[in-house]
Amino acid sequence: MPTEQTHNVVHEANGVKLRETPKEFFERQPNKGHIHDVNQYKQMYEQSIKDPQGFFGPLAKELLSWDHDFHTVKSGTLKNGDAAWFLGGELNASYNCVDRHAFANPDKPALICEADDEKDSHILTYGDLLREVSKVAGVLQSWGIKKGDTVAVYLPMNAQAIIAMLAIARLGAAHSVIFAGFSAGSIKDRVNDASCKALITCDEGKRGGRTTNIKKLCDEALVDCPTVEKVLVYKRTNNPEIHLTEGRDYYWDVETAKFPGYLPPVSVNSEDPLFLLYTSGSTGTPKGVVHSTAGYLLGAALSTKYIFDIHPEDILFTAGDVGWITGHTYALYGPLLLGVPTIIFEGTPAYPDYGRFWQIVEKHKATHFYVAPTALRLLRKAGEQEIVKYDLSSLRTLGSVGEPISPDIWEWYNEFVGKNQCHISDTYWQTESGSHLIAPLAGVVPNKPGSASYPFFGIDAALIDPVTGVEIEGNDAEGVLAIKDHWPSMARTVYKNHTKYMDTYMNPYPGYYFTGDGAARDHDGYYWIRGRVDDVVNVSGHRLSTAEIEAALIEDKKVSEAAVVGIHDDITGQAVIAYVALKEGNSDEDSEGLRKELVLQVRKTIGPFAAPKSVIIVQDLPKTRSGKIMRRILRKVSSNEADQLGDISTLSNPQSVEGIISAFGAQFGKK
């Protein structure tokens, strides 16, 4: 039986009305949907769980091109940590993303590149992309890069980043992309951990109207990177003050001019690594997550096609960077595997104004838009006046990624961006999952604002009691979200540390993959992601989800964002401390009155036991580059350990920390 607390959480979810897909969505579909209705989805899902060989085998042959057919669809277990898919098969990721489309339709747009300054924007066709990828691959091959090697990529979100990744994959090597915003120290750590033989970068980056000396950061990092032998430098700004290190650094344009526009791709085994990607530092030391080639490619293609309802005529705009998994899977691999154009955006949603996203959608008639709630909150704060200037009628599917989208942001997204005419896909997944785990299929699964809905094909989701470790059967329940069997795009290991992989994902609940997140499953079987399991506070025996308390706080129209942490309390075990940032125009609000109002809001929404001990009003919350709130920072400050914050240089807004320390000190009488 669920506890009263669990029942209350799920009861709140059950009260949300189902939203059917608007008729305009179907009117805008260029072809019939891939799945007719939710019943067909459920039938396909059941087959994917009960007969994964019979389900995924034919799909792998349909969506991917093979140099040598596979003989075994699925092998290994979660418990043993030896998952493998499509054994015996051979293929190449670059061929699947580029060549086959270039041969069939060379003039079709592949990369629609929107630069920070719109005047620098351009389009690469599939034919162009094949030539550019082959030339860069030729350079790398001449440097001795081969199957089994790893090459680092430290580039902004531009065409060259995509070309570099595909060129590395063309040779059967693995790419390790580092977000072009990390410090020299972070670059060094990632390059050394992956033993990268080469690095691909640029002179400078342009983002939000600002210029960043990318090459300088790389030079600082490479002082302590003994494995890097060569560096390829793209001239983004052509700044004459950027200098090369003789014998190590070479300019992109000079070197690629030496090689022909076609280089045959290298076949690799299905389980050979395609890439490494380091998880963000919000959970401690970054882990180099390793994704295999065939399984990852199938996951990317399958989820892009079915969850977003992608057709050959569509144009996907994923507002995510290739420095993160969203950019890998849904800006690069997913759309290119399906042969559709992908919009690559170098800039920010606020430059030159808050209408930039919508200007891009209108200009290219994008059919799909995929973005993080962090950006949506920023745009909502700026107001709707920038949205109404643009024609967004080409849009059919709106996606959300990176964190659960709160019902109020969902409603705003639906009304002002989608005009109540689009399907919204609130997607739940992870760097480690490679592709979507839980999401409502566009045009198929009705929505519940705030819920990620049903698991995707092959994802046998389960809720685990965190105390007993036993699976919770049935609906109307809450627990730790786990997965009962492996799926094609699941990460295979942590680079050079399989023990860490097992301890992190497989050993907490043997026989299950541990997501690290809590979730509720309502009476319809819809999943509601409740945030990280470690983002739970225990007040007087009540286990409270911080995400639930945060949702209650942002119901107040004055609050833009909220983050909740637990601190030690002699009486209750833990106490709730809430940090809130206000919307523009509310900074002069009576802070004491607002604090009391917010405490009352939580008491009313959840119960007296969940009421924050203190509400601290701040200018901004500390975030990672991918937009996730760093609650670790807030916990340290709240525990009077501000002198033990560690490295905060990888935050997107490190200046926020000083304001948080000051606000906490002012309220608790400490400096």
UniProtKB/Swiss-Prot annotation:
It is an enzyme of class 6 (ligase). It catalyses: acetate + ATP + CoA = acetyl-CoA + AMP + diphosphate. SUPFAM superfamilies: Acetyl-CoA synthetase-like. CoA binds at residues 207-210, 326, 540, 603. Its EC number is 6.2.1.1. One of its GO terms (cellular component) is cytosol. The keyword Transit peptide does not apply. Gene3D superfamilies: 3.30.300.30, N-terminal domain of ligase-like. It comes from the Eukaryota. ATP binds at residues 402-404, 426-431, 517, 532, 543. GO terms for biological process: acetyl-CoA biosynthetic process; acetyl-CoA biosynthetic process from acetate. Keywords: ATP-binding, Ligase, Nucleotide-binding. PANTHER family: ACETYL-COENZYME A SYNTHETASE (PTHR24095), ACETYL-COENZYME A SYNTHETASE 2 (PTHR24095:SF245). NCBIfam families: Ac_CoA_lig_AcsA, PRK00174.1. This is Acetyl-coenzyme A synthetase 2. It comes from Candida albicans (strain SC5314 / ATCC MYA-2876). The gene is ACS2.
